[in-house]
């Protein structure tokens, strides 16, 4: 079982303890860590909606360290990011692979960042199917439709052409932070929080 650090805050009513993620949520920071799956996606979407309700004009920071995961779960987070009123900044710490890289790219323009030693990976969706030939054929058609949709999302957020995106995503394509900036997944490589605050000032 993973240990979650607790922090203690002094108030005029005494002490109050929070788990570290709840305390950071008060600062409008959300962590997207680990595999992207339905339960995790629901928690991230709920936090985004909560922070929108608290203040629809104040930005939200999404910190990403994820190997990717289920496409539909990732698209639930993506759609919520686009749906809510606050601008969502994204910051890759560690890695943003597969759906993680799409969510990194989906941050508000000029507010998409990565730390210098981050790794970003983009690729086409994959899936394994078994059953009758007709069912496999339907699954294949569906995954091709999903591939086109994901390509369109990368085109929208990176400024690359559809052909460039399709070619790059044909196989696992790994990038360091500088390469991710050149490709359009992020806007800036950050070495210090001061640079992030300068961008948003």
From Swiss-Prot:
Q: Name one GO cellular component term.
A: endopeptidase Clp complex
The answer, when asked if Protease is one of the entry's keywords, is: yes
| Localization, UniProt | Cytoplasm
Matches recorded under SUPFAM superfamilies:
ClpP/crotonase
Which InterPro entries does the record cross-reference, listed alphabetically? Answer: ClpP (IPR001907), ClpP/crotonase-like_dom_sf (IPR029045), ClpP/TepA (IPR023562), ClpP_His_AS (IPR033135), ClpP_Ser_AS (IPR018215)
Listed Pfam families: CLP_protease
Q: Which CDD domains does the annotation name?
A: S14_ClpP_2 (cd07017)
> What EC number(s) does the entry state?
3.4.21.92
Please tell me whether the keyword Hydrolase is annotated for this protein. yes
Main location per the UniProt record: cytoplasm
Sorted alphabetically, the Gene Ontology BP terms of this entry are: protein quality control for misfolded or incompletely synthesized proteins
Q: From the UniProt record, which GO molecular function terms apply?
A: ATP-dependent peptidase activity; ATPase binding; serine-type endopeptidase activity
Q: Which UniProt keywords apply?
A: Cytoplasm, Hydrolase, Protease, Serine protease
| Top EC class, one word | hydrolase
- Active site: residue positions: 98, 123
Q: Which region is the signal sequence?
A: none
Catalytic activity, per the record?
Hydrolysis of proteins to small peptides in the presence of ATP and magnesium. alpha-casein is the usual test substrate. In the absence of ATP, only oligopeptides shorter than five residues are hydrolyzed (such as succinyl-Leu-Tyr-|-NHMec, and Leu-Tyr-Leu-|-Tyr-Trp, in which cleavage of the -Tyr-|-Leu- and -Tyr-|-Trp bonds also occurs)
Q: What does this protein do?
A: Cleaves peptides in various proteins in a process that requires ATP hydrolysis. Has a chymotrypsin-like activity. Plays a major role in the degradation of misfolded proteins.
Family designation: Belongs to the peptidase S14 family.
NCBIfam families reported in the protein's UniProt record: clpP, PRK00277.1, PRK12553.1
Q: How does it assemble?
A: Fourteen ClpP subunits assemble into 2 heptameric rings which stack back to back to give a disk-like structure with a central cavity, resembling the structure of eukaryotic proteasomes.
Q: What is this protein called?
A: ATP-dependent Clp protease proteolytic subunit 2
Q: Which organism is it from?
A: Rhizobium johnstonii (strain DSM 114642 / LMG 32736 / 3841)
Which lineage ranks, top first, belong to the organism behind this chain? Answer: Bacteria, Pseudomonadati, Pseudomonadota, Alphaproteobacteria, Hyphomicrobiales
Q: Which gene encodes it?
A: clpP2
